[in-house]
Amino acid sequence: MQKHTLRRLPLLIAAAFASEWIYAADAAQNAEQVQLEEVVVTGERTNRSGFETATSNRVFSTPNIDRSGHNLSATDLLKQTVNTVDLGSGNDLPTVRGVDGSGPAVGAVAFFAGTRPRLNLSIDGRSATYNEYAFGTQSLWDMQQVEVLRGPQSHVRGQNAVAGAVVMRSKDPTDEWEGALRLGLGNQKTRNVAGVVSGPIVKNNLAFRLSAERQQRESYEPFVSYEPTGNPRRVENTNVRFKLLLTPENHPDFYSRLTLNHIRSRAPQNEIMGNTASRRFLKEKPVFVTGSTSGIWDVSWQLNDYLKLENKLVYGRYHNERLHLPMTVSPQGVPAELKGRELQWEPVLHFSNKGRLKGFAGLHYFRSKQDEWVDIRSVGGRNTFDDRNSVRALFAETTYSPSEKWDITAAARLEKETHKRSGGSGALHLDLDKGQTVFLPKIDIAFKPTDQWVSGIKAARGYNPGGAGITFGRPVVTYTYEPEYVNNYEWYTRWRSADRRLQLSGNLFLNHYRDMQLPFYLGTNSVVIRNAKKVHTYGAELAADWQATDSLKLTTGLGLLNTKIKSYPDSGIEGNKLGRAPKYTANIGVKYLNDKGWEAGGDVRFYGGYYSAADNAESGKISAYNQVNLYTAYNFKQGRVSLYADNVFNRRQPIFISSADRQDALYQRPRSVGVSAEWKF
């Protein structure tokens, strides 16, 4: 019965869209006080309403980031976003429209080849490294807004954004005193303590904000304790953020903001128990300890009515350790360490003639250096690497409005990247010194016949740079791979009722990838990265938001997807689908809040079947699955108390299988229940 329901799901949601269109006829005559929230998308370097943003987007803003009290990380929001498959903490970043956000390399392959993620995650303008994203927790505490942008963002962000971007923005200091304290408690030894205080240092001139959070829980898998990791089941995260905001009273067109952020996380490499009877897995689970400290300095100055100058300076240091058995204890032990630092500078000039022309132009400079070592017996013992990356780019965007009904936007980015990676062991040595210059254009034509309807087409080019690596299984060889490119084409439409209580949105997309970086197996445990000549993906994202009454809000989303590796000679996977690329994903959400402060809500998420990897092995095939999450809460003047239950029916289906052994499966996280209390002052 469940399988039949899942198969009919796209038809059911399509019917829901049709019924909501019918609603529009009477909308203007039934305007109510409560309207849908108007969101502003900032992740594409300009402030643009979500309604007018061509990019397929899902925006979570305060106070709706965490209604349940249990949305603690960005991964919890990505799981609510259609056409994404998020597995949680571990090697594999989310897939977006079937494209693996991790990039072509994860795990040991990434340690030798370096990391080239395809999904960019930024917090207050600083992009997280692969290890921070994969094994850390991107805390939602004290966040103002989180934007999920699907599709290539290379023209905006350059490298590492060919699949999309997750843009997180924390709250700014306030000129009035405010604060909050949150305590959370749940099963699986879940604990959460968070606090924030904000207020003026010099009234109307200088304000500060200090926030901190500590999260911890215990993995549901029965990993055994050992040295040097201790208990691998411990999942912990500490996040401290301090902000200073200068807004001179005598210069209202100027502000300067300093953000200091420190994160430290600890988590098992993944929550897969694995078949410890096989030679592939040890019973001792590796643990990643990830830390970073960064400073971000933003300056904005409205020069006159037509020009505004913004400048961003970012400096960060990060440190990642893979704790595991040393080789002297076990030949299968693979401890590793990575230390790095980065610098980013980005000035941007915004212009507008207060009429038909507006846009921006800027420079981007990025430089990083990291030192790595990894012990692995099959590749000569200790391997050390020196990795240096520099990026210089010019970018610009202009929107011309020939009339009130038309907007024509042209954007481009010219980027030069240089990547040096050297190292290895005595047996094999890697020496990469390569640069490339790419031109990344975008064109967007929007038609706005009324204030209630926007429709348009857009085309953009994306890319991700190449690299080099060493295999860690026989045959052991060095290799290089080239950059990958994508031509993205989309048609989009947005419609809302006159009373702003119903909004429909849709994006149809077609992606032509050239030289997509995919694994190529030389042997059972020997994998290199090569470039597939052609990969095509196409599909759609549809969404509806309806404020049915002043107290009741309904949301629904549907993602449709088809992927195919069109040309990859001699790989054995030509003609296959990409991994973690279900034909459909969907969600239905509800929130009820009455004027007495009582609240209840939840969502149901559906995933069609998919293959775990591009080899499309039957042993890695995942069946369709779903999950139900519920919460209830009471809101009062100075706070809120909520009860939550995620995975209410305790579904425990496999969602990812990392090898040919079905015992090596990642399962849905067991039912989690708990309580969260927040006090504001």
Label each PLM-derived region with a short phrase.
Residues 404, 408, 416, 510-512, ...:
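Gram-negative outer-membrane beta-barrel transporters
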Residues 1-85, 111, 198, 253-256, ...:
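N-terminal Sec signal peptide and the immediately downstream disordered periplasmic leader
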Residues 606-613, 632-681:
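C-terminal beta-signal and adjacent terminal beta-strands/loops
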Residues 183-187, 214-218, 260-266, 315-319, ...:
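Transmembrane beta-strands of outer-membrane beta-barrel pores
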Residues 253-261, 290-324, 332-435, 441, ...:
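Face-selective signature of the C-terminal outer-membrane beta-barrel domain
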Residues 298-302, 306-326, 448, 455-460, ...:
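Membrane-embedded beta-barrel scaffold of Gram-negative outer-membrane proteins
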Residues 34-176, 491, 659:
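Acidic, small-polar-rich N-terminal luminal/periplasmic segments of exported/outer-membrane proteins
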